[in-house]
């Protein structure tokens, strides 16, 4: 069930909100039970058989947590639980990749049936691994099965995050004031509308200039440099508006029930370094990789060479977390390399005592280099095949696709738009859309800043002119965002991070 579907918007969500409000009148506990039940139904609506997997995962990890109350047994049970979670994740997500790799190296064809990847398995598995690791570190064991179930399964974040921490979620479920603020609900609805607009109006339309081109290259075709750059930049913006739009929608939905989720995006394309980019992009994943992988590996405490090795290993595994394939490994490896170079640069500046703030020219150059590096890495993230990624890179830099004619395909073609305006004019239309989307990403405040959410409750003065207030004007803007999104929902494109 997609957030951007009529079934969700006009059936599931109203029914859940009304049932929650009615249950809350009885007791806070009843409201939490309703949310837990609704969340399980939400997941089961996709494929009921995998609801059993989710329930089994929750029951297993909750029971392991209870068993870890005994300090003597805690390390062994915790290690077993982490290994078991990883084994389940590896079976569903990496079996095909492992067997394909073995077959390629050995030359022996291995026949196996495709395994359907359960939605959100990377997210709910990592959250529960973090829970077990925290108990091993001395955190309190959760004894309430309903609160634990909702921590894992709360439908706004269940499928594609944000990755949440038990310590920031479970206490909220137990507070009696949860869900009682009308202003909080109004802010949540407006944030949801903004996220839906980013997904349906921006991301899905940008996809029409990216997906057909990448598919064409994956199939062995070629494209001229102009179309290669248009598709790559369109995807760069598509994945940002798609995933940040989902995160905004999740935050907004949670606020309808008085629950606060963590911020997941902080205008990442405004970053002037790769280090800063990862403090702004998929913030909750960066937090997980730092706290449960990079720091346990030694972080930067064991010398510079070990720090760079830890960075590379962390980002390689971060790439594999996104998907089972060499393209994701290369994407993660590139970002590990970028981060290492960035830290080397900082170390060199420090050794030269160049500690003054960079000037405008240096910041502009740093921003351009950072964005260029991120864009190139996205090629591997998006391409379905290594050959397709290679052809895209060749086309971007003029080594491939010279003299190649490309006829646009996809939804735009089915709408006869290329026939009406011609391929060259269509290229200009796509360029205009990309330019507009970049302007939004680079020069406007992000949704959390506009709505004063979380750490942006005291937004800088320069954003005061667009700051959200519970008034008629913002009610109108919310209605316009919702209505324009509803008209665009006929495409029914899934969120990109559903595949992870």
Question: Residues of each region from the PLM?
Answer:
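Membrane-embedded transmembrane alpha-helical bundles that form the catalytic cores
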Residues: 1-499
């Amino acid at each position: 069930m997609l957030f951007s579907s009529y079934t969700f918007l006009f059936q599931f969500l109203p029914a859940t909100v009304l049932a929650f409000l009615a249950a809350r009148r009885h007791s806070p506990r009843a409201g939490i039970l309703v949310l837990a039940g609704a969340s399980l139904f939400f997941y089961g609506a996709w494929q009921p058989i995998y609801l059993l997997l989710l329930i089994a995962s929750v029951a297993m990890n909750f029971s392991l947590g209870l068993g870890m109350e005994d300090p003597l047994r805690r390390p062994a049970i915790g290690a077993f639980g982490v290994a078991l979670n990883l084994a389940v994740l590896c079976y569903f997500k990496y079996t095909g990749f492992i067997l394909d790799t073995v077959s390629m190296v050995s030359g022996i064809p291995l026949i196996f049936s495709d395994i359907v990847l359960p939605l959100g398995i990377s997210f709910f598995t990592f959250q529960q691994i973090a829970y077990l690791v925290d108990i091993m570190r001395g955190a309190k064991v959760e004894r309430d099965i309903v609160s634990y179930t909702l921590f894992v399964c709360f439908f706004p974040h269940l499928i594609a995050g944000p990755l949440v921490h038990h310590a920031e979620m479970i206490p909220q479920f137990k507070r009696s004031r949860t869900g009682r603020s009308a202003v909080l609900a109004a802010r949540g609805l407006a944030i949801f509308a903004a996220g839906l607009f980013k997904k349906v109006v921006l991301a899905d339309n940008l996809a029409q200039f990216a997906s057909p081109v990448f598919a064409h290259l994956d199939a062995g075709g070629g494209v001229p440099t102009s179309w290669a750059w248009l598709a790559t930049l369109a995807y760069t913006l598509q994945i940002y508006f798609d995933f940040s739009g989902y995160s905004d929608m999740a935050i907004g939905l949670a606020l309808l029930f008085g629950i606060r989720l963590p911020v997941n995006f902080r205008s990442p394309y405004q970053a002037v370094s790769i280090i800063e980019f990862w403090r702004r992009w998929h913030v909750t994943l960066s937090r997980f990789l730092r706290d449960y992988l990079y720091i346990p590996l030694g972080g930067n405490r064991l010398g510079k060479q070990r720090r760079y090795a830890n960075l590379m290993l962390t980002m390689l595994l971060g790439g594999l977390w996104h998907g089972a394939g060499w393209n994701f490994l290369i994407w993660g490896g590139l970002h590990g390399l970028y981060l290492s170079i960035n830290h080397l640069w900082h170390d060199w500046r420090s050794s030269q005592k160049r500690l003054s703030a960079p000037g405008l020219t240096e910041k502009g150059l740093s921003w351009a280099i950072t964005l260029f590096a991120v864009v190139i890495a996205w090629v591997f993230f998006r391409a379905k095949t290594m050959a397709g990624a290679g052809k895209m890179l060749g086309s971007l830099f003029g080594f491939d696709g010279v003299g190649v004619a490309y006829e646009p395909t996809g939804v735009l073609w089915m709408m006869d738009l290329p026939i009406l305006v011609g391929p060259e004019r269509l290229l200009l239309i796509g360029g205009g859309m990309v330019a507009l989307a970049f302007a939004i990403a680079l020069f406007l405040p992000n949704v959390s800043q506009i709505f004063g959410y979380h750490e942006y409750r005291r937004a800088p003065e320069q954003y005061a002119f667009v700051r959200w207030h519970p008034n008629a004007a913002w009610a109108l803007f919310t209605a316009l965002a919702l209505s324009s999104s509803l008209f665009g929902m006929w495409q029914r494109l899934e969120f990109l991070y559903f595949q992870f």
